[in-house]
UniProtKB/Swiss-Prot annotation:
Keyword set includes Transferase: yes
Known partners and oligomeric status: The RNAP catalytic core consists of 2 alpha, 1 beta, 1 beta' and 1 omega subunit. When a sigma factor is associated with the core the holoenzyme is formed, which can initiate transcription.
Full protein name: DNA-directed RNA polymerase subunit omega
GO cellular component, one term: DNA-directed RNA polymerase complex
One GO BP annotation of this record: DNA-templated transcription
GO molecular function: DNA binding; DNA-directed RNA polymerase activity
Source organism per UniProt: Delftia acidovorans (strain DSM 14801 / SPH-1)
Length: 67
């Protein structure tokens, strides 16, 4: 299993603070039942970071505040 590093994600979202917010929002969406955009069996937090690193999710997460 390949490890996800912050550097992988920073290539997609250069600002660390925005990266944390986007990953948190996406992880919350995944834990509420949204479909992952990648094949994975990881927990929501890791899945969110993988989606960001692969460019499947980006700063648009900051415009979608989970409810």
């Amino acid at each position: 299993m390949a490890r996800i590093t912050v550097e992988d994600c920073l290539e997609q979202i250069p600002n660390r603070f925005q990266l944390v917010l986007a990953a948190t929002y996406r992880a919350r969406m995944l834990s509420q039942g949204h479909t992952p955009r990648i094949e994975t069996k990881n927990k929501p937090g890791v899945t969110a970071l993988r989606e960001i690193a692969e460019g499947k999710v980006g700063l648009e997460m900051l415009k979608k505040v989970p409810g």
